[in-house]
């Protein structure tokens, strides 16, 4: 497995941050936080840049709230500036991770997703009238961060990038 370096400078590059802002606001232009950020976009992108290059990087706390759809769930979201950071990171890391995935990995990938996964599952299952719908309880909360970080270290050797 080839390890990738010198990613941090690409992530914090101003043009990448601007692209990240455009992606993060897509479909959310009516939100007050997006409008406020966009009013002073250059200044706010500089603040994000400064937060990212600080060691350790300055991150905001998650905002949590409950929804009932159809059962009670706790939702965690980050403030809009951190969302821009996430997009900046993924703009650079997505191609790195795409090379690691097997073809039939469907979640959160361009041109894939739940509909493509369902089509493939139906194709494999033939004409079966039965299916299994499941929800892994507290899946993201149960991910072992030590194991995840070890996996990331095998792919990424840029220490500054790993701090993010």
Task: Give the positions of each predicted feature.
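Non-catalytic, polymerase-adjacent accessory regions of viral genome-replication enzymes
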Residues: 1-46
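Generic recognition of stable, solvent-exposed alpha-helical segments in well-folded globular domains
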Residues: 2, 12, 43, 83-84, ...
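Charged boundary/loop elements
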Residues: 3, 25, 94-103
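Reverse-transcriptase-like RNA-dependent polymerase core
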Residues: 16, 48-71, 84, 91, ...
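Short, conserved non-catalytic motifs in the polymerase core
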Residues: 27-36, 60-87, 100-112, 132-133
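Conserved polymerase palm-domain catalytic core
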Residues: 44, 51-52, 70, 103-104, ...
């Amino acid at each position: 497995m080839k390890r990738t370096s010198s990613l941090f400078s690409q992530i914090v590059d101003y043009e990448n941050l601007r692209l990240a802002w455009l992606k993060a606001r897509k479909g959310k232009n009516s939100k007050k936080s997006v409008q406020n950020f966009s009013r002073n976009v250059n200044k706010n992108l500089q603040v994000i840049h400064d937060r990212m290059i600080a060691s350790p990087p300055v991150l905001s706390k998650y905002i949590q709230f409950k929804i009932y759809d159809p059962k009670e769930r706790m939702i965690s979201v980050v403030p809009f500036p951190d969302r821009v950071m996430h997009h900046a990171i993924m703009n650079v890391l997505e191609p790195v991770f795409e090379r690691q995935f097997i073809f039939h990995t469907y979640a959160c990938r361009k041109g894939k997703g739940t509909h493509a996964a369902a089509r493939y599952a139906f194709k494999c299952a033939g004409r079966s009238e039965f299916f299994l719908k499941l929800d892994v309880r507290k899946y993201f909360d149960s991910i072992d961060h030590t194991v995840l970080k070890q996996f990331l270290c095998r792919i990424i050797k840029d220490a500054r990038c790993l701090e993010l």
